[in-house]
């Protein structure tokens, strides 16, 4: 989501309409906050704005409880408190984020980074014994985030042992303004203040704050500075000076200071207005905030200022540094809003050492639907717990789980790799199929070739070609998948100049579409007739094999899938009842030149070459995940030591569960560390064009989170 500057008022269609006169109950935690709230209420009444009432409680915790029980509706929380408020039993969610910065450069978060001199030859996992510079004790960018990140390397078993003592022993010298210099003198030994001001958490200590931590590094009082990414630019406007520094990345690489959005310890979120996750008053809350910032925001002539507090007071109701609000997309809950890196850093400070180490070594796989979960549970048992499992109904749910750290990995097709990449995930290993150009010994290091996306038809169903598909019935693997949706529908959209896919075909089965639409009319659900059009294996026409089944059972006239699907399910290769008598010769392919060809001639008759499926994860998990999966496939891969005797990664009872069944191995993908590099420029451009045809709540959420 982009900030619409200069107004900073996001006038959505709903916001332009007259909102219902629903009273928003704002929760205040002090007499001063209540006084400001009552004045806000009075000023809104004067200008005919949305109704507001004020509720006073004695603590933030009591306000949270009041919101849960409908005795209040909204309040503003910082990240740490929001972390607790988002969990059961409260389950509050962010409705609007405070915006900081300027109209020209607004921001809803900042990046906590580790800065070193360009001549440094150490990585983030090699800081022990070096000198450190911090913004201050207990502060996010200078303490909580870096120390939480370094938690696995500290000789600290967790509470109640002193964290400060462990840090003082980890670094040789430090400046941590605000630390107890009598108890932990090493934490103050690098500070530059004099007398009582040495190590003070105030401007009197030259090395205090964001700029101070960087100054500590520049003065050679430390080897690494933990500060804010933008601080380097604020303090070093000269490019030649900036180029003398670089960043330490969580994956133990270096990047230029200009790339702090890609190389940071955590993204620290701004304060946010929270409410109940039931969404009963979200529209009213946003309309109140929208009109309030328009009438009483920064630089308004009104005597009442929304982002100001009386003399002697600070940050009443909202941060005084805020310049406005931005609406938080519905898909963004507290876990997504706070980001994995932020929440993990905070959580690590409350964990035992062995738990932190165990969580970093463990891989949690995300399974889509019950059948994938069953196979994953078998993998869990065979791996002796090295791989654990979690399950969600849809692929997008799994992508969100990986973003939040509830899961670590899954294998995706190109369409979902595109989505995952927009959400900050990266490809780790690619599914590699057999190649006629080489033997299986080089599979792990062999470049992936991609697969052929085709339009399959029954040979007997003659009389139509690619250009005469309009009005036919279609079978798709699922919405947003490569061979089954992105490629064919992208081609059709370009040809017809229309996004009305539900009108192009008379009926379809496109799992993941609106169940009430024509795009789901051919779907059959599970054996009980339930879960119709579900984007998982409960829909029997879902996936490559499901799309072929839809065609074979004469529900559809054309199936969009990959060429190998037909080869793997005909002439006795699939013994399921629906496929038992299928013959390869009974199917043909539609070519873009309006001819038909046998399936065996797919190289000369396909819609596009599609990128192979790939395993995706967060950047912090790449190294561990690659090690674990390469070890697992030695044991359970094709011709593995314990396959087929115990478990096989690339075999499925009902086809293509977790991985494609025709996968020979999971292969390394050097040099393709982002989804865009892996997918290729042409595929990305084509997918972006197709995405213009529809809205995606997940892509909207990820655009907001990565802006």
From Swiss-Prot:
Glycans are attached at residues 118, 494. CDD domains: PBP2_transferrin_C, PBP2_transferrin_N. GO terms for molecular function: cysteine-type endopeptidase inhibitor activity; heparin binding; iron ion binding; lipopolysaccharide binding; membrane destabilizing activity; peptidase activity; protein serine/threonine kinase activator activity; serine-type endopeptidase activity. Residues 1-19 form the signal peptide. SMART domains: TR_FER (SM00094). GO terms for biological process: antibacterial humoral response; antifungal humoral response; antimicrobial humoral immune response mediated by antimicrobial peptide; bone morphogenesis; defense response to Gram-negative bacterium; innate immune response in mucosa; iron ion transport; killing of cells of another organism. SUPFAM superfamilies: Periplasmic binding protein-like II (SSF53850). Hydrogencarbonate 2 binds at residues 477, 481, 483-484. It comes from the Eukaryota. Disulfide bonds join 27-63, 37-54, 133-216, 175-191, 188-199, 249-263, 366-398, 376-389, 423-702, 443-665, 475-550, 499-693, 509-523, 520-533, 591-605, 643-648. Its main location: secreted. Poly-N-acetyllactosaminic carbohydrate moiety seems to be needed for TLR4 activation. Hydrogencarbonate 1 binds at residues 135, 139, 141-142. Its EC number is 3.4.21.-. Residues 24-351, 363-692 form the Transferrin-like domain. Belongs to the transferrin family. This is Lactotransferrin. It comes from Mus musculus. The gene is Ltf.
């Amino acid at each position: 989501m982009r900030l619409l500057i200069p107004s900073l008022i996001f006038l959505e269609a709903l916001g332009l309409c007259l909102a219902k006169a629903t009273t928003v109950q704002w929760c205040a935690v002090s007499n001063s906050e209540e006084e400001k709230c009552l004045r806000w209420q009075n000023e809104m009444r004067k200008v005919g704005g949305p109704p507001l009432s004020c509720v006073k409680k004695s603590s933030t915790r009591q306000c949270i409880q009041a919101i849960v029980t409908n005795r209040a509706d909204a309040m503003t929380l910082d990240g740490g408190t929001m972390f607790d408020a988002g969990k059961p039993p409260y389950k509050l969610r962010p409705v609007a984020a405070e915006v900081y910065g300027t109209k020209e450069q607004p921001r809803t978060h900042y990046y906590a980074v580790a800065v070193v001199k360009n001549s440094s030859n150490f990585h983030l996992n090699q800081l022990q014994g070096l000198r450190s510079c911090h913004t201050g004790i207990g502060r996010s960018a200078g303490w909580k985030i870096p120390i939480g990140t370094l938690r696995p390397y500290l000789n600290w078993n967790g509470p109640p042992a002193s964290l400060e003592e462990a840090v003082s022993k980890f670094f040789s010298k430090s400046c941590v303004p605000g630390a107890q210099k009598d108890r932990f003198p090493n934490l103050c030994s690098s500070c530059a203040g004099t007398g009582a001001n040495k190590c003070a958490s105030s401007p009197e200590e030259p090395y205090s704050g964001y700029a101070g931590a960087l100054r500590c590094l520049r003065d050679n009082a430390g080897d690494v500075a933990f500060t804010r990414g933008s601080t380097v630019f604020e303090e070093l406007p000269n490019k030649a000076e900036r180029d003398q520094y670089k960043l330490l990345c969580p994956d133990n690489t270096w990047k230029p200071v200009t790339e702090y959005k890609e190389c940071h310890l955590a993204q620290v979120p701004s304060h946010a207005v929270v409410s109940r996750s039931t969404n009963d008053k979200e529209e009213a809350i946003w309309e109140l905030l929208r009109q309030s910032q328009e009438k009483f925001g920064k630089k308004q002539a009104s005597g009442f200022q929304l982002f100001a507090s009386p003399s002697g007071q600070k940050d009443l109701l909202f941060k005084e540094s805020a310049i406005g609000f931005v609406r938080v997309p519905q898909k963004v809950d507290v876990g997504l809003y706070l980001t994995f890196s932020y929440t993990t850093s905070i959580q690590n400070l409350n964990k035992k050492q062995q738990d932190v180490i165990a969580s970093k070594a463990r891989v949690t796989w995300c399974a889509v639907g019950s059948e994938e979960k069953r196979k994953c549970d078998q993998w869990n048992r065979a791996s002796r717990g090295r791989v654990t499992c979690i399950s969600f109904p849809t692929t997008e749910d799994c992508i969100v789980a990986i973003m939040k750290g509830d899961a670590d990995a899954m294998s995706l097709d190109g369409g979902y790799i595109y989505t995952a990449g927009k959400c900050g995930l990266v490809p780790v290993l690619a599914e590699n199929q057999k190649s006629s150009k080489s033997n299986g010994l080089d599979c792990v290091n062999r470049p992936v070739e991609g697969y052929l996306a085709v339009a399959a038809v029954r040979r007997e169903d003659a009389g139509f070609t690619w250009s005469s598909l309009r009005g036919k019935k279609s079978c798709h693997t699922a919405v947003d998948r490569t061979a089954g949706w992105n490629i064919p529908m992208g081609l059709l959209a370009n040809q017809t100049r229309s996004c009305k896919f539900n009108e192009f075909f008379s009926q379809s089965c496109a799992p993941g579409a609106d169940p009430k639409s024509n795009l789901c009319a051919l779907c059959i659900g599970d054996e009980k007739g339930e879960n119709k059009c579900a984007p998982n294996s409960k829909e029997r026409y879902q996936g490559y094999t499901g799309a072929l089944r839809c065609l074979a059972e004469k529900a559809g006239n054309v199936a969009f899938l990959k060429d190998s699907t037909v080869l793997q399910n005909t002439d006795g290769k699939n013994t399921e009842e629906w496929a038992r008598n299928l013959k390869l010769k009974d199917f043909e392919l539609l070519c873009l030149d309006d001819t038909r060809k046998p399936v065996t001639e797919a190289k000369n008759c396909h819609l596009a070459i599609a990128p192979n499926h790939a395993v995706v994860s967060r950047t912090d998990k790449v190294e561990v995940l690659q090690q674990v999966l390469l070890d697992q496939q030695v044991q359970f891969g094709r011709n593995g030591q314990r396959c087929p005797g115990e478990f096989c990664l690339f075999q499925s009872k009902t086809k293509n569960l977790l991985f494609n069944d025709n996968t020979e191995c999971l292969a390394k993908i050097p040099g393709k560390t982002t989804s865009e590099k892996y997918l290729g420029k042409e595929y990305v451009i084509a997918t972006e064009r197709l995405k213009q045809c529809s809205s995606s709540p997940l892509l909207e959420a990820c655009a907001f989170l990565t802006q």
